[in-house]
UniProtKB/Swiss-Prot annotation:
TRNA binds at residues 17, 68, 70, 116. It comes from Shewanella loihica (strain ATCC BAA-1088 / PV-4). Monomer. It catalyses: an N-acyl-L-alpha-aminoacyl-tRNA + H2O = an N-acyl-L-amino acid + a tRNA + H(+). This is Peptidyl-tRNA hydrolase. It is found in: Cytoplasm.
Amino acid sequence: MSNIKLIVGLANPGDKYEQTRHNAGAWYVNELARVCGVSLVADSKYYGLTARATLYGKDVRLLIPTTFMNLSGKSVGALANFFRIAPDEILVAHDELDMPPGVAKFKLGGGHGGHNGLKDIIAKLANDKGFYRLRIGIGHPGDKSMVSNYVLGKAPQTEQRLIEEVIDEAVRATEVLFKEDMSKAMHRLHSYKAG
């Protein structure tokens, strides 16, 4: 059984960024909210959109920070501190350049891999890297100098469909995580082939 109490979807705020690759984490949390039948509402105390939900029989908080990506830790830290949620009870969903569209993987701990949202969360959790991640593949533009424009751009329709399909599978794997355990959820998600 999972001990996850907070699920975070990283994003940049506003309509301008809503459909950009960098917001893949928020797409996952929005889909979880839809499955639970809850609406995320703005909460200035936590600098984000939040909801309390019963997810597969467990009480969890959903959070999409409304800070810019590089300040995500302000939101995550505020909510985690208020509800006394430990880093190993947090799952952060984020876009992942090092995996192609249609691939997603759960992971515990690790560095930030250059992801500014993760970097700020680690800093605001007193440098504790021991939180879970859901890495949602968006692919890489091929050249480091193109990364910023790439993550802030919209995926072509074929890639977008693959990202949406793997997010749907990640939601199904989250059910396995909550009803069984992380290793079974990992096996399910990591063996999934989109398309």
